[in-house]
Every structure is written in C-alpha cells, then in structure tokens.
Amino acid sequence: MKERYDFKEIEEKWQARWAAQDLYAVPDYSDRPKYYCLEMFPYPSGKLHMGHVRNYSIGDVVARFKTMQGYHVLHPMGWDAFGLPAENAAIKHGGVHPAEWTLDNIESMRAQLKQLGISYDWNREVATCHPGYYRWTQWLFLQLFHNGLAYKKKAAVNWCPGCATVLANEQVKDGGCERCKAPVEKRELEQWFFKITDYAERLLKDLELLEGWPEKVKIMQENWIGRSEGAEIDFKVEGSDDIITVYTTRPDTVFGVTYMVLAPEHPLVEKLIAGSKQEAEIKEFIRKVRNLREIDRTSTEAEKVGMPTGAHCINPLTGEKVPVLIANYVLMEYGTGCVMGVPAHDQRDFEFARKYGYPIRVVIQPPGVELDPAAMEAAYEEEGFLVNSGPFSGMPNKEAIRAITRHLEEKGRGRFRVTYRLRDWLISRQRYWGAPIPIIYCDRCGTVPVPESDLPVLLPMDVEFKPTGQSPLAECPEFVNAACPSCGGPGKRETDTMDTFMCSSWYYYRYTSPRDNDAPWDRNKVDYWLPVDQYIGGVEHAILHLLYSRFFTKVLYDLKLVSNLEPFSNLLTQGMVLKDGAKMSKSRGNVVSPEDIVARYGADTARLFILFAAPPERDLEWSDQGVEGCYRFLNRVWRLVMPLAGLLKEAPAAVSGKLVGANREMRRVTHSTIKKVTEDISARFNFNTAVSAIMELVNALYQFREIPESDRNPAVLREAVESLLLLLAPFAPHITEELWEATGHRGSIHLQPWPSYDPEAIAEDEITIVVQINGRVRERLLVPAGITPQEMQDRVMKEPRVMRMVEGKKVAKVITVPGKLVNIVIK
C-alpha cells in the first residue's frame, strides 16, 4: 500500500495511460444521446493563466459528468491563433516570426492543458493559422461575397495608432483600443464589411430562443443591436432641391423644432457652406471635430459646440424656416447624421439652445400644468398632451406619434422607420498575421473573387510585418501580383487580412470534421453534433464573438449549409479569478502561475480549488489557504481509501438485507450525497456546493471507519467509497483513477456509470417538528417520519411541557403543517 499521496507520480502515470489508450477520442456517431461541450478556445499566448484554468476545469467537469451519465460527449480544443496579439508579441520578442512564435506557444499550452488532465479529444485539434483551416475561412468569405453580404466601401473607420490597424466598433472601449488602450482615431479608408445589419432583426428576435443563456448577455446583445422605432422626416433645404432627412423617435415633437443640426461629416455640409462668408471658419471647425474621439463627441459631460451654416431648411408641417447648424455631438454613423433640435423636450437640445440663444417652443404640456418656456430650467421629456401643434393639439403625445407619422406619409414628407444601433461588421485589418482576403483587383474586370479551386490564398512567410499603417502584404510583390481569374490579365491581390473574429465565428463547426479536405465540415456530422449543448467562456465576449457567431450561423442556415438556427443552446459565463480584490495582472504583481500551483500541489488540487472556491458565474478570490485546504482534503481521501483497499476488494458488491444504526445512517449519507452532487452539477452548475457535499461524505466515512469491524457492513462501506470516488472523479480525475484501480476495479473510472441514488435509502426514520404556542417556538420533538397531521396534534398535546403551558387556558385552535410544525393558539 502506498501510504503517501504522491500527486506527481500519480498524475504523470494517468496522463500517460490516457494518451496511450486515446481514452478521450470521440467517435463521430453513437446510439447514445449526443452532448457537445465546448469552452472558448484561447489565443496561444504561451502561458495558461488562472482564468484559463477556471474555464477549462468547469468544462471538464461538465464533459466528464455527462460522459458518466451515458452521453456521447464531444469535448474538443483548438487555438485562435491569428491576430494582433501574436504579431505584437513576435515584434516585442526580437522579430521572431509570428508563425514560429504561435506554433511554439501552442506546443507549450497543449502540454499545460494535458498536465491539468482535461479530457480533450486532441485528434480534433484545430489552429486557425493553419492553411487547412483558413482555406475554409476564405471559402466562407467567398460565400458571403457571392451572396451580397461582403462588400467594400470607403468609410470613416476606427484607427488604432498603437496597433496600426482598423478596429471594428465592437473593439473600441471607452474611446480606446480594447487591446492596447491607445486613443482611437477616425480615418477614411477603403474597407471590407459584412452586412450583419441585414440580420439585425433576426439576431434580436431569436434571443428569445436562447433560454439557456444568462439574461445579462442577452440584454447586452439587445442593447448593442439597439432597435428603435420612429420616423424619417424630410426637411427641404431653402432655395434648393436638397432634402435633409432626419430620423427621430419623437415625431410628436416636430412642431417644436427650432433648429437643425448636421454632423460635420454629413454629405450636404460642403454644399451648404460653399461660398458663404464663414466657409473657411466652418471648415476649420470641421477639421478639429473630425480629429476628436467618438467618445469625446458623444459623452454627456463633453461640451456641445456648434456653428451655423447660414442655410435654412423648411419644417414640413409648419412651413417655418429652421436654421441649419453643424455640431460636434452629431455623428454620421448614427441615424441619418442629423438631429432636429427640440429644446423644450430634449435636455441636450435644451442646453444647446440656451447656450446659443435658439427659441424654446413648448409643444407637449403635462396634465394640469402649463409650461412657460422662459421659466423652464430643464426640458420636459415626459408624457403629456400636444399644444401649438396644429390639428394634433390636444392629442396624447403617444397617440400623436402614430398620427403625425401617418400624416407625413400621406403627404410624402416622411415615413415610419425601424433603425438599429448595430453597424456592419468591418473585417479588414492592415496587419500581417491573419487570413488573406481572397480577392484580386483587375483594371479590366474590377473586383474578382479568387476561385474556390485556388484556395487557400497562402499567407507568405517572408514578409516585413512590423506595423507601418500600411498592409504589410502590400510590400510583398510575390504575393500582390497575380493573374486575374476572369481574364488572365495582370491583377493585384487584396493586401488586408481578415479580422480574427472571422476565424472564431465558425470554429465550432470545424471540430466535427477537422481533417476534411473537401469541405469546411461534413454536413451529416454537423447536423448530428450542432448546436453546441454547453458553451463556456467570459462575458467580455457578449457583443463580439458571441454576436458574430450567431450572425454566421444564421447566414449558413440561409445558405442551407447547416440546420441549426443558433450556435450555442446553453451559455455559462464564468467570473474572473481575482487576487487581493483585483484582476490578476503583471502590472499589479498579483499573478499566480498555474504551473507553480500544479508543481507544488498537483493538478487535482488546482482544479478542486478553482471549482470549490466560488460558484462559476461569480468572481473567485484566490486564496493560498484555500489551495492548502483542498490539498489536505485530497490527502484525507487518500488516507481514507488506501488502507481499506484490501477489504473493499473482498466486500460484497451489493447491499442486501435490512440495515440499522450506523450502517443505515452511512448508506443514507451516501445516497443523499449522490442526490445532492447530481443535482448541483446537472441543474445548477453549483460545483462549489457539490464539492462541499463530497467533503461531508468523507467526514461521515471517517466516522464509519472507526466503528468496530464486526458492526460495520462491508457492502455499505464499499458502496460509500465507490460512490465517493465516482462523485469526485470529474473534479479530481487523477487521484480517483489511482484509488479506483487500487480498490480492485478494472477500466477507467471516467468510463463508469454515474451513481444513482436510492430514494428509500435517504428516507429518514424520524423527523423533527416544531411546536409553537401563539406563534412562538416552545419545543422541538422527534416523531416518526410517516406521522399523520392528527397524530402530530395528539403527540404534541400529550407532551408534558406543552400540557403545563396550556393548562387553565382555552385552546382556540390548533394549526398543523404536515411534517413541519404544530401551532397552538390559546386565549
């Protein structure tokens, strides 16, 4: 018998055996119900951090649990290997090529994951930087292109000077780059976009299908999509045929418009100011505004600055001339790039009008109150009745919204419109380490897609990839110069690469047939495995990866390439791992290395602590004492089971006969624990309380072990120890394999059936009921478990202490809650 828990020897032994047996390889099909468990794949930085350990440990418990429950489980892993982090890291580390850097990091991180004992099917591993993968990323781009969902246009884009590339709107956080934090600028560039806006309504509506998603994530996506209903209203420019079309959710206030504001980027501005006295001054104002960050223009705290153009437009309902201005707070990207100023009923407009002296005209009055524009200290933005609004005066403003919109439609001066905050997905990147966009430009034929037979368009290795603001591929003539696929003449390849989120928007399909050279996936396999049953990752991906993946799935569904409407049925967003109350980071000096913890305590201890310390969706505070405690617990399990190994091998496999005393209680605790752990994992993912219940079972087993062997039923002991190991196996896979083998079992514990509880075993002989007198607790009594309400009353009324308390009093009534309490009401 091995007296000492040697985690290093045990973990190396079982990791080697699992690999030799290919234990976690998953056949493509099975008669068992399928279960696809997936954690978000990582960027290969080279080092796992504790957030990774938490993410993958959670997924591994789910995968192992479902396997033991009889499911056919797909649990793959791969690498989100393209993108700026790898390129920037390669530049930082002395010009090492991103490919070499990335592949070395993959080797390192794969080894670390295997050290943790995660049950991945490594036969299905993918890396997005491999030509066999990005060939199909390019193929998917072509499907969007051929179906009008990929297009190129000149646009004002988010430019990160730190990363020297364009960012999608979703990659800008508080006016800065989400990766390097540099202030984001606006630039006009020719860029490729995907028409995600074509799917805005479906992306919004189908959130209802995602019953297994956290509400907070659905709300984040709903807000990002930003659906609003309103009206487009046409204001004719005075003395011109030009029209200023404004979008508003408040057409009920159009009679209160006293000025019109255009974004400096609005296409009409140049025409409106041409030849005016202040043209040069306005152009200088526009130049300054365009250099401002978006957040500085839209912040509620930022000063609102405007300039009159000298032009006027005509209110389509009143015929009144309205001055046209430009201002820093209006953006071309939102609505139609213009805002009608209604200072009486919009606080921002109110402040702007007061600052520049524009009239304030009340057109909505609150019930029973008359607003005086001169006395107003703030805009009135609540509901009320229209005034000063022609034929609509007296109408409730909610009703007027519809009535005025209909009137504008009848007159041909406006229309009902639904708009979205969501903008098309910008996928062009002016960096090297990404999938090349499969497009060739020909002077004769224009924009020509690369034929599918010519894929992949390989990323050349001999390229100067340091950021200059230009696409590095543009400096590689061997890549750039290519024959036009249409006419055979000279052509130029697109030199931008694709946003890495393109690669991660479909990887969960590729896992189903990762070595298929003829298609991105086998349709039969995708239809069998998809959607993903359980997806696990950080909430920070709510409006990036998760939204893009939903968009891709809907496009693929429309193209009849998949059968699932949504990619992920259930989503778990785990919390962060904190130390000293803050997120772990090198700058704070509070990083805990998973490698150090595994070397000192073992992978099973690291996993157990991560799973025990907090519910998965909550932030977890790192605790060295907590790690020590989990290590001591595993040592307790070892010291409990190993001395019993010989006895357990000889014990009967099944419990028989009537049990009493300690044997009955031990079996009750065993089956109660099975019930508790099963429910905690399957219904709630409450791994922390599941581990706590297992710890209580160990305590009970230690007590049971101390009773004389002659009084101890060996079958009860065997059942309890086997149950302990089976319940603990998903959390601590190595030690449980070793103890399972030591106690005489053949075959991996991870392929055993999950234990089921016996309802009769957990039924208690006696229960405790509460006795109240006039609602105050006076006594607690042990009574038989199957006692009837009448028997409860009879038992309580015969209790000596109760009899003394009610003696000489009138019992008004007796209230009985079956199995719980008896309340005697006396006067």
From Swiss-Prot:
GO terms for cellular component: cytosol. ATP binds at residue 586. It is an enzyme of class 6 (ligase). One of its GO terms (molecular function) is aminoacyl-tRNA deacylase activity. Belongs to the class-I aminoacyl-tRNA synthetase family. A motif ('HIGH' region) lies at residues 42-52. It is found in: Cytoplasm. A motif ('KMSKS' region) lies at residues 583-587. This is Leucine--tRNA ligase. Disulfide bonds: none annotated. Its EC number is 6.1.1.4. Its main location: cytoplasm. The gene is leuS. Transmembrane segments: none annotated. It catalyses: tRNA(Leu) + L-leucine + ATP = L-leucyl-tRNA(Leu) + AMP + diphosphate. GO terms for biological process: leucyl-tRNA aminoacylation. Keywords: Aminoacyl-tRNA synthetase, ATP-binding, Cytoplasm, Ligase, Nucleotide-binding, Protein biosynthesis. It holds the Pfam family tRNA-synt_1_2.
